[in-house]
């Protein structure tokens, strides 16, 4: 993994990151420190552009402001009914978009990301978000990141969260430019979640109230385990495994 500097003032950060990633062997990728952020670039396919985490501007910010609040499907799936404010572990954090939505609605969210490269992008995005005057205070309070295998981190949690959220990597059929770009970069970097079926038993063991699994509409149940209910959207489905009712706060 190459680490490139387009902003010389970030040399110290680059050195720390290089020492953290010294066991990762991805010659076709580079992590680039630009003046604005940390970016992941696929060197052999530069037309794919950069992948990075941005909670302050762009699509994620638009979704926070205009995405439907507690009426959106993910909020219903995790149980954000009137007064309930569950603690959530997102065990397959990726670029953190769903975790950010839940945090913006008031949940305390622990993000688990197995890829050290993706975790570095997430950490950079969280750090920049924490410095933003509008969202910084609650991002710092409600979002924390753990790096490592999801099952190991789930089983090592000091307290059982109310909800565990899973969105395992699944081959995408959609042809949208954004999905194609990010999924091509992601799947060539981290590959599919081959241990995805092992996630569900660990999540069911550790969640106090419910487990939510996000699936493409064409995918079967995770681990072939029938959910208590499903909430369907245009292209995805939230399979919900309910263990106990969520108390209103």
Swiss-Prot record:
Instruction: Give yes or no: UniProt keyword rRNA processing.
Output: yes
GO MF terms here are: rRNA (guanine-N2-)-methyltransferase activity
Give the EC class as a word: transferase
Tell me the keywords, alphabetical order: Cytoplasm, Methyltransferase, rRNA processing, S-adenosyl-L-methionine, Transferase
Per UniProt, where does S-adenosyl-L-methionine bind? 97-98, 113-114, 167
Q: What is its EC number?
A: 2.1.1.242
The role this protein plays is: Specifically methylates the guanosine in position 1516 of 16S rRNA.
Q: Which family does it belong to?
A: Belongs to the methyltransferase superfamily. RsmJ family.
- The name under which this protein is listed is Ribosomal RNA small subunit methyltransferase J
Its encoding gene is what? Answer: rsmJ
